[in-house]
UniProtKB/Swiss-Prot annotation:
Superkingdom field: Bacteria
HAMAP family listed in its UniProt record: TolB
Keyword match NAD: no
Cited Pfam families: PD40, TolB_N
Signal peptide: 1-22
PANTHER family: PROTEIN TOLB, PROTEIN TOLB HOMOLOG
Protein's UniProt name: Tol-Pal system protein TolB
Keywords: Cell cycle, Cell division, Periplasm, Signal
Provenance organism: Xanthomonas euvesicatoria pv. vesicatoria (strain 85-10) (Xanthomonas campestris pv. vesicatoria)
Length: 439
């Protein structure tokens, strides 16, 4: 863990602690935890019933993997799927009651013309023998994973009442080479690590990616000009804009919920303070003015205030200040080190990197019932950079493991953890993107 403040120390060192990797490789998922209390669900293989070439994507496998990694569900192993219905009329509910499954998903893939496919699927409550969901989706071959994630989202929401977040993306930073030959890349991938896309490459460090609320742009820090600078980049076109390159530190950008403003940490006056930039006029408003180090701003969901990390009390803690400025209030009191806040969509939960001695873990403060309660989400010793999924069901974070950087996603109740790892190399600085919209 970089101390006293993770982001500031990274800036002053001008170096990310990353080792060699192959940038072309995507992240792969390894589920390293599970929960016996997860809801049993059978996701039956969905065969291709067309006359052409079958899609390469195994739809049911993607749906099942999504549900598994949510921590809310436990899919029936393939070896125990004794019957393979493809439509509701073929389901023998007593079979699945005997196998103690609460739900069953069946479906099939057909041709839709012009190289596209049509997926029809149904969700059933096994105990009641009733259909809960029946939908059809059409997509070309290269979008079948997207369709699969959307199916998982619909199933998740129908059962839990919470919008699914499988059809989302994550951003992260990788690096290749060693010493002076280090090369950095800002990447975007699906939430399960597939379909990696390089957003920008640089011979200098890249830090702090942050998504615009519409998911179309990333703000990030680059050192390509010799000093830290903040850029906005369009993910689809690659067009980018330099928005902050003041003397000293330009860091930790964070889009406002309406996408019109950017919170950032600047030391243009000599000491790191929190500012807000109007992205239309580029006008700056200084929110804090303190001799302590103020950094790592992140917006409250309503856009009315900003959380940030400050050591003004002697040790790093999370504070909150109105988006228009004013006095700041301390938010965290549990432990001696709380930094890098991520706030859930409803503002009731705050995930932080929490330190004790030389150990840093991801912890969550939950204010759903009024008084704050704390839980530890990660078991590592150098865990940092928490980032909530848009539905707050999971938290993505960075860890050091075996001398290299990996990402983990943990369910917000800490029941299930999954590792997102490169076969050879490091990955850091994760940021979970917003919901996507079908066009």
């Amino acid at each position: 863990m970089k101390k006293p403040l993770r982001w500031l120390a990274a800036l002053t060192a001008l170096l990310l602690p990353l080792s060699a990797l192959a940038q072309q490789q995507g992240l792969t998922i390894d589920i390293v935890g599970g929960s016996a209390s997860a809801t049993p669900i059978a996701v039956i293989p969905m065969p291709y019933q067309g006359s052409g070439t079958a899609p390469q994507t195994d739809v049911s496998a993607v749906v099942g993997a999504d549900l598994d990694r949510s921590g809310q569900f436990r899919t029936l192993p393939a070896a125990q799927i004794v019957e393979k219905p493809t439509r509701g009329t073929e389901v023998q509910f007593q079979t699945w009651r005997t196998l103690k499954q609460n739900y069953i998903v069946v479906g099939r893939v057909m041709d839709a013309g012009e190289g596209a496919y049509r997926v029809e699927y149904e969700l059933f409550d096994v105990a009641k023998g009733e259909r809960m969901l029946g939908l059809a989706m059409t997509a070309r071959a290269n979008a079948m994973r997207d369709v699969s994630h959307q199916m998982a989202d619909a199933i998740y929401e129908k059962i839990t009442g919470v919008r699914g977040a499988f059809w989302t993306r994550i951003a992260y930073v990788t690096a290749s080479g060693k010493g002076g030959a280090m090369r950095y890349a800002l990447m975007v991938a699906d939430s399960d690590g597939y379909n990696p896309q390089t957003i920008v490459r640089s011979a200098e460090p890249l830090l702090s990616p942050n998504w615009s609320p519409d998911g179309k742009k990333l703000a990030y820090v680059s050192f390509e000009r010799g000093n830290s600078s903040i850029y906005l980049q369009d993910i689809a076109t690659g067009a980018r804009e330099l928005v902050s390159s003041f003397r000293g530190i330009n860091g930790a950008p964070s889009f406002s919920p309406d996408g019109r403003r950017l919170a950032l940490a600047l030391s243009r006056s000599g000491n790191p303070e929190i500012y807000v930039m109007d992205l239309g006029s580029k006008q700056l408003t200084q929110l804090t003015n303190h001799f302590g180090i103020d950094t790592e701003p992140t917006w409250a969901p309503d856009g009315g205030s900003i959380y940030f990390t400050s050591d003004r009390g002697g040790r790093p803690q999370i504070y909150q200040v109105a988006a228009s400025g004013g006095s700041a209030n301390r938010v965290t009191f549990q432990g001696n080190y709380n930094a890098t806040a991520s706030v859930s969509f409803d503002g009731k939960k705050i995930a932080v990197a929490q330190g004790s001695g030389n150990t840093y873990r991801i912890a969550m403060m939950d204010r759903s019932l009024g008084s704050p309660s704390w839980s530890t989400l990660s078991p590592g010793s150098l865990d940092e950079s928490p980032s909530f999924a848009p539905n707050a069901s999971m938290v993505l974070y960075a860890a050091r493991e075996g001398g290299r950087g990996v990402l983990y996603a943990v369910s917000s109740d800490a029941r299930v953890r999954q590792r997102l790892v490169l076969a050879d190399g490091d990955v850091r600085e994760p940021a979970w993107g917003p919901y996507r919209t079908a066009h």
